[in-house]
From Swiss-Prot:
Coiled-coil region list: none
Organism: Streptococcus pyogenes serotype M6 (strain ATCC BAA-946 / MGAS10394)
Family of the protein in this entry: Belongs to the DHPS family.
Residues annotated to bind Mg(2+): 19
A molecular function (GO) term: dihydropteroate synthase activity
TM ranges: none
Catalytic function, reaction form: (7,8-dihydropterin-6-yl)methyl diphosphate + 4-aminobenzoate = 7,8-dihydropteroate + diphosphate
Pathway annotation from the record: Cofactor biosynthesis; tetrahydrofolate biosynthesis; 7,8-dihydrofolate from 2-amino-4-hydroxy-6-hydroxymethyl-7,8-dihydropteridine diphosphate and 4-aminobenzoate: step 1/2
Sequence positions that bind (7,8-dihydropterin-6-yl)methyl diphosphate: 59, 93, 112, 176, 212, 248-250
Name listed for the protein in its UniProt record: Dihydropteroate synthase
The protein's role, per its UniProt record: Catalyzes the condensation of para-aminobenzoate (pABA) with 6-hydroxymethyl-7,8-dihydropterin diphosphate (DHPt-PP) to form 7,8-dihydropteroate (H2Pte), the immediate precursor of folate derivatives.
GO cellular component: cytosol
Quaternary data: Homodimer or homotrimer.
EC numbers, comma separated: 2.5.1.15
Length: 266
């Protein structure tokens, strides 16, 4: 499998989540020192992660805005330390071009933008400048749709075209339907059912639903975040079967066997 110029063995891969934030919904505050972050990265690599997704700002509903300066202070030391110690691809989870540039300079390989280049208008130019793969996620301000799956597909197609127009090569563009972002539980359910339509847009798809509210709903409600890993793994299997190629998860080990087996059947 290729992500731009990078090659990953197999037809599917796990992206392990590393939140260096105090307020992420699942593990906020757990990895706020470089050493704690490195220890977690080492475990995720041992468990089978092929990409580490580093985030310095929580994007959960109601989270506090973090300035680019503070975000850079959180992520750059961790990215540098990962690069110095491990041979692993790193993505930077940010929608701010200033943070993205600092992360790429520190050694990040991939841009993961939850606003698909809409925040400041410079992310696509940066991706083109660095020849960096970029993941474009569906997002919007309100949970209002004509038909959620079609609207998500239209958005992703339009943002991918905007990236192409800005000079990003097609093989550097990935898309993410954005489960849990500006979507009700029912809308997330509908999008899950229509996931194959997203996978038919002509771009590789990242699937990120780990521990989110819709997973809790599928389990009947009232579960804690870390109690959703088994259901997350089941949804990873579903997504890979629909055509997704990367699953973004908190618990790498719970997903590794699923990805290893299904990767050989894709």
């Amino acid at each position: 499998m290729k992500i731009g110029k990078f090659v990953i063995e197999g037809n599917a891969a796990i992206m392990g989540i590393l939140n260096v934030t105090p307020d992420s919904f699942s593990d906020g505050g757990s990895y706020t020192t470089v050493q704690k972050a490195l220890d977690h990265v080492e475990q995720m690599i041992a468990d089978g992660a092929k990409i580490i997704d580093v985030g310095g700002e929580s994007t959960r509903p109601g989270c506090q805005f973090v300035s680019a300066t503070d975000e850079i202070d959180r992520v750059v030391p961790v990215i540098k330390a990962i690069k110095e110690n491990y041979d692993i691809l790193i993505s930077i989870d940010t929608y701010k071009t200033e943070t993205a540039r600092a992360a790429l300079e520190a050694g990040a390989d991939i841009l993961n933008d939850v606003w698909a280049g809409l925040y400041d208008g410079q992310m696509f130019a940066l991706a083109a400048e660095y020849d960096a793969p970029i993941i474009l996620m569906h997002n919007q301000d309100e949970e209002v749709y004509q038909e959620v799956t079609q609207d998500v597909c239209d958005f992703l197609g339009n943002r991918a075209q905007a990236a192409l127009d800005a000079g990003v090569p097609k093989n550097n563009i990935w898309i993410d339907p954005g489960f849990g972002f500006a979507k009700s539980v029912q809308q997330n359910m509908e999008l899950l059912k229509g996931l194959d339509r997203v996978c038919q847009l002509g771009y590789p798809v990242l699937f990120g639903i780990s521990r989110k509210r819709v997973v809790d709903a599928l389990l009947g409600g009232n579960t804690k975040a870390k109690e959703r890993d088994g259901a997350t793994a089941a949804l990873s299997a579903y997504a890979l079967g629909k055509g997704c190629q990367i699953v973004r998860v908190h618990d790498v080990k719970a997903n590794q066997d699923i990805v290893a087996v299904l990767s050989q059947l894709m």
